[in-house]
């Protein structure tokens, strides 16, 4: 993998991109997102202390979208991501594996999982590692349901299930723990976030910390918050996972990405999720 550690400032690569037509766009602040007229979503708030002033305000990706895209997310009837949530509900109630259990056998209903998405990724003491929601689903399927072939990490079935888990947590505050045994993975994620990748020598920070609100290829750069994932991307006509988006970003730098579900991407997700502590869960969000 081609990478270069960011030592400070905006790199020559960013200057080249800027010279190619990136223009500063006004951030539309102050607008409110209330899903279905009853679930208020925090779209801007003060950053967590552990960012040490890297951002003055946290902004949901919703802030950077057009009126049309915003409206789609505000109503479940118009949100295409909810079609995948419905598929997740069907899977939730379907028995799988040799044990003959469904998710509902243990959890009764999806709403009982409302506290999951706001706190993940999180340290799993039994397995001695930081786990994402996807890893937890795989653990349940293999260890409790007897599935020899659990959902693939980025499979459609997995994305449907994680979209369901996110949907029941909408409006709950993101509160990802980064202390204790999770701190080592968090530090790795932070290192990856500030590392330049690919031929363009770009880091996550150079786009999403130093240039959010600017236009690149006719689209607004956001802060790269992950509180809306899995996200329905209009360009993909499907819901997209956090790691799939990480992979796409690194590919955009003309670099070779880590594997989906790899320890590196798990660490990066932990770090990026913690940057959004104080926002609220809004997945499945709608983005370009």
Residue ranges with predicted function:
Residues 1-4:
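N-terminal secretory signal peptides that target proteins for export/translocation
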Residues 6-84, 121-187, 235-257, 265, ...:
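Post-cleavage N-terminal segment of exported redox proteins
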Residues 98-104, 217-220, 286-287:
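Extended intrinsically disordered, low-complexity coil regions enriched in Ser, Thr, Gly, Ala
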Residues 99-110, 161, 189, 199-211, ...:
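The canonical Cys-X-X-Cys-His
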Residues 114-121, 216-222:
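Short cysteine/histidine-rich zinc-coordinating motifs and their immediately flanking basic loops
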Residues 167-219:
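Extended amphipathic alpha-helical interaction segments
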Residues 191, 198, 206-212, 224, ...:
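C-terminal cap of thioredoxin/glutaredoxin-like
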